[in-house]
Amino acid sequence: ITVNTLSLGVDMAMFNNRLDLSFDWYNRRAKDFADFGASVPALLGANPPRRNTAETETKGFELTVGWKDRINDFSYGATFVLSDYIGKVVKYDNPTKLLNNVWYDGMTMGEIWGYETEGLFKDEAEVAATDQSYLYANWYPGDVHYKDLNGDGKINVGNNTVDDPGDRKVIGNNTPRFSFGLTLNAEWRGFDASVFLQGVGKRDYMFSSASNYFWGFAGNQEHSTYYTIHTDRWSEDNPDGYYPRAYFNTTKNQLPQTRYLQNASYMRIKNLQLGYTLPKTITDKIKFQRARLFINVENLATFTSLPDIIDPEIISPDAKIYPLRRTWGVGANITF
């Protein structure tokens, strides 16, 4: 593999070093790593050898802005960090641009291909007027109604290529965009406080059919998990429910689609700490050089549109990772 990187940066400090700024932009080109190789006749009876011909390009930036100052007995500071990147496939040996989870020339890394949805089928007449037999044989009210994008009267994958994807399109991108962090701190007469916030500004996510945390039903009873959010499910008594008709034996309603594409952006109060440093008049009496008491909280709060049972920081396709816990702690820093 050959990697060439062009990087441009600037660092500056102003206002007697109270404000500092750092910015880096990069363009990274990776060449000569393995792809699946050219197609060979089936008569050969073996898969083609991999060849080092693939090429990608990644562009991104990192920005850091900091401010610190003191006003009499009060000192404070703030540091903001923002980064972003986007990757493209420049070259890959996929001349027909198949969509079988392989790259193709011009592809944006993290693309989510899926169906656009009309909603859930309302009645038998609507089911009868829509041909989704390619995806599954039987459909009923409460099932997902996929949209006929190419106007051929049936829902399918076409030739499963970029040029003929059937009724699919790029519906989102799961690359975390605009990752950020903000640190705030202050100190006044022995009291101190600091808080660290971090998150992702933009990200789309489509949970797989194996995600019982998101779907509730995951193809079989022993892997299914039913939470309060899953009670908002279609039924004859709840025709406007969010989740589709319930099944244990099919994933036809859980295909990548716009209805259940999730906004996975978030902001989390990752750490909050409050402290107090004992005055010297007290530490001298107890023979300490310095003593500081503090209380600390990890993962205090998370702001996201994802269901509460899914942690956006450690998200995975099947969403079976246990969320990060909120932890409290107290302690002391003592110097003898």
Language-model region placement:
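Short, glycine/acidic-rich beta->alpha junctions
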Residues: I1-N4, E57-F61, D163, G172-F180
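Extracellular/periplasmic, surface-exposed regions of secreted and cell-surface proteins
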Residues: I1-E116, K252, P256-F336
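Conserved small-residue
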Residues: R70-N174, F214, T225-Y226, T231-N238
